């Protein structure tokens, strides 16, 4: 009798729950040994990885996959190098598990503190990019969590080949294979099962398009770490240094167009707009960026600037398109960001400390920056070593989610025969 998708996912979940208890108590040396052995296995399996990936690429082309998705799917030699190096870098990161902080004696005589512990079982749902298999598996393993990985059907062969290397690493370290499991079925019902198993899965991390994340957020019966959009802003204050403003606004938009930390709307104080917008517009036009602006922006820069609509202020373009709005003051800038932004990353360019501090305090986003490009909103750039994603939620993890974001804390209490009176 053929196993149903629900039965299959239940079997994976039960195995992951059991494995989570073993990986939670694994030593740092044991976890690092698994990571380094997996890196060696990847290095030794380049031909197998390439062959599996070529099969996925051929299937993708036959199914009419868009060029951008085919590019994400491809495991080039450089990307395999990056995966190998990524495993080795995670092995070098400090192990957060078991760390005790804030120990203090209380009047009763007991000593109370907090210990960092794994979350348990983490389900990762992602699309296209097989390198996410390594990112997710390595961070979950190092943070003492078991993980169930459900990649896109278009990358199934690549993910299987990568998972085989991870399994070799686990075996070398004498850790159970169930610490990292890849969902083998391409049936979409597997996603529905994974996100509705609170008895086996402690948290879900979806990485992919907006429709996937919306579905997971709507239907999940376990907590979700996510972000929906990256509608990021740069506000150029009246007290901005012109050179800094131009450099930051250029980089925030044109460094790369697709990432979620790319600026989508530029806000400029009316008192500085005539000095900063014309040179910026020239840079954007030279780089092929389509400009959409408010009435004052169009009056200043010319009719070739498309009239911005209400929808533009809400839009994450992930393309060479930029919305520009001239605002009367800091209050209007903050109000605009808190109304139309996605609570991801927003920046102010200003030499005025009180304006910058107000922006820092009042903009309700996961990352708020002063005189820096929004492109810095990244786990590696924040010194986390790696990230599993970026969260715009306020509970548990917020911003780039690295090792610590995949852990929780429990209270630990030390006594010496103490009883409560």
UniProtKB/Swiss-Prot annotation:
Main location group: cytoplasm
Similarity field: Belongs to the gamma-glutamyl phosphate reductase family.
Name recorded for this polypeptide: Gamma-glutamyl phosphate reductase
Keyword annotations from UniProtKB, A to Z: Amino-acid biosynthesis, Cytoplasm, NADP, Oxidoreductase, Proline biosynthesis
GO terms, biological process: L-proline biosynthetic process
UniProt cross-references to PROSITE patterns, sorted A to Z: PROA
Gene: proA
Pathway(s) this gene product operates in, as recorded in its UniProt entry: Amino-acid biosynthesis; L-proline biosynthesis; L-glutamate 5-semialdehyde from L-glutamate: step 2/2
Source organism phylogeny: Bacteria, Pseudomonadati, Pseudomonadota, Gammaproteobacteria, Pseudomonadales
NCBIfam families: PRK00197.1, proA
InterPro entries associated with the record: Ald_DH/histidinol_DH (IPR016161), Ald_DH_C (IPR016163), Ald_DH_N (IPR016162), Aldehyde_DH_dom (IPR015590), G-glutamylP_reductase_CS (IPR020593), Glu-5-SA_DH (IPR012134), GPR_dom (IPR000965)
Cellular component aspect of the GO annotation: cytoplasm
Domain of life: Bacteria
EC number per UniProt: 1.2.1.41
Subcellular location: Cytoplasm
Listed GO MF terms: glutamate-5-semialdehyde dehydrogenase activity; NADP binding
